[in-house]
């Protein structure tokens, strides 16, 4: 049985690519046709890729791999946070800060700073400071929560990055590839399938399309982790 049906993808608008002038020729094998100057993605091939992505992701989770979801565009931000949280993955959904992976030591220190500030806030320590100092600390806390809040549970570098919009998140792609971190990527018609291990050709701009694909990948991670836990109990 298919992980995602053709009708589900059609309803989500997963078949709509970009304008034909904004395409990457490497995506030609995933394109069905062009209509009114817009490329239409071959959803039969998307379904096959999605089956492969589900199995690959499930097996990675079963073997204990750690996941990071990345998607900072407005229409993906909430979905990224929601689905990553649902499957216990870390996430970046506001802005990719340079060095999030390649300068992990510094980034980890910033995450620890965030945790310290949260403890200070919850204990009332910040409220006891002079008004101006408290305001500075709260601004710092707010900024760190915005950009690093999704990474608080990430103690080590991830093994897999799940990506929405390869072009927008090009810095994340470069850092992951530099560190040999696997990439599972939603690929619109302007993307490069050679830059990821697990391609999923689909519309990466429509909220419903992003929700559908990330939702299934989160399901795969949860299923894989349940299998891993069951094996340990036995």
UniProtKB/Swiss-Prot annotation:
GO terms under biological process: translation
Database matches in Pfam families: Ribosomal_S2 (PF00318)
Keywords: Ribonucleoprotein, Ribosomal protein
Listed SUPFAM superfamilies: Ribosomal protein S2 (SSF52313)
InterPro entries: Ribosomal_uS2, Ribosomal_uS2_bac/mit/plastid, Ribosomal_uS2_CS, Ribosomal_uS2_flav_dom_sf
UniProt xrefs under NCBIfam families: rpsB_bact
Family in the record: Belongs to the universal ribosomal protein uS2 family.
PANTHER family in the record: 30S RIBOSOMAL PROTEIN S2 PROKARYOTIC AND ORGANELLAR, SMALL RIBOSOMAL SUBUNIT PROTEIN US2M
Name of the molecule in the record: Small ribosomal subunit protein uS2
Organism listed in the record: Prochlorococcus marinus (strain MIT 9301)
Lineage: Bacteria, Bacillati, Cyanobacteriota, Cyanophyceae, Synechococcales
């Amino acid at each position: 049985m298919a992980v995602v049906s053709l009708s589900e993808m059609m309803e989500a608008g997963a078949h709509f690519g970009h304008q034909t002038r904004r395409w990457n020729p490497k995506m030609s094998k995933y394109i069905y046709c062009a209509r009114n100057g817009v490329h239409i993605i071959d959803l039969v091939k998307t379904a096959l890729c999605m089956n492969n992505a589900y199995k690959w992701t499930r097996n990675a989770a079963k073997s204990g791999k750690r996941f990071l979801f990345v998607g900072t565009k407005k229409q993906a931000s909430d979905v990224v946070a929601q689905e990553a949280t649902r499957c216990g993955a870390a996430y970046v959904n506001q802005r990719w800060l340079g060095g999030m992976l390649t300068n992990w030591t510094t980034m980890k220190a910033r995450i620890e700073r965030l945790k310290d500030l949260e403890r200070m806030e919850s204990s009332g320590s910040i409220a006891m400071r002079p008004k101006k100092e408290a305001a500075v600390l709260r601004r710092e806390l707010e900024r760190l929560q915005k950009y690093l809040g999704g990474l608080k549970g990430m103690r080590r570098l991830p093994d897999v990055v799940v990506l929405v919009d390869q072009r927008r998140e090009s810095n994340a792609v470069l850092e992951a590839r530099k560190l040999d971190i696997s990439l599972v990527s939603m690929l619109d018609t302007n993307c490069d399938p050679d830059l990821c291990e697990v391609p999923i050709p689909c519309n990466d701009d429509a909220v419903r399309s992003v929700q559908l694909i990330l939702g299934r990948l989160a399901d795969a991670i949860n299923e894989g982790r349940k299998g891993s836990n069951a094996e340990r109990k036995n």
